[in-house]
């Protein structure tokens, strides 16, 4: 995964989201890539390209201790930045991310069980 980063950088030269993130993090580490809107309107926490790359790599390293490239990762996250970090962490680690909302306390677990049954062997993240 190597992208030639220079002033005439062309994103179409990147073949993966990770290559694109790495290029953007190298060119514009302080530029905001995500802003979380906790109430749907007011800007809350922001994340820069550099922060996203750093956090995702740290997560990928932890995944790498327990997984192999191509493993499936069931991602049980509510909406938010933690999901974004884990999703990119999966990509850095070569895992197949399978996002799903965590079940509510009063919710039937049938939907989640169906997802897990369809995946076979899987790791769960939350």
Question: Can you name each region flagged by the protein language model?
Answer:
Residues 94:
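Structured binding elements
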Residues 11-35, 54:
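A short N-terminal helical cap/helix-turn-helix that marks the beginning
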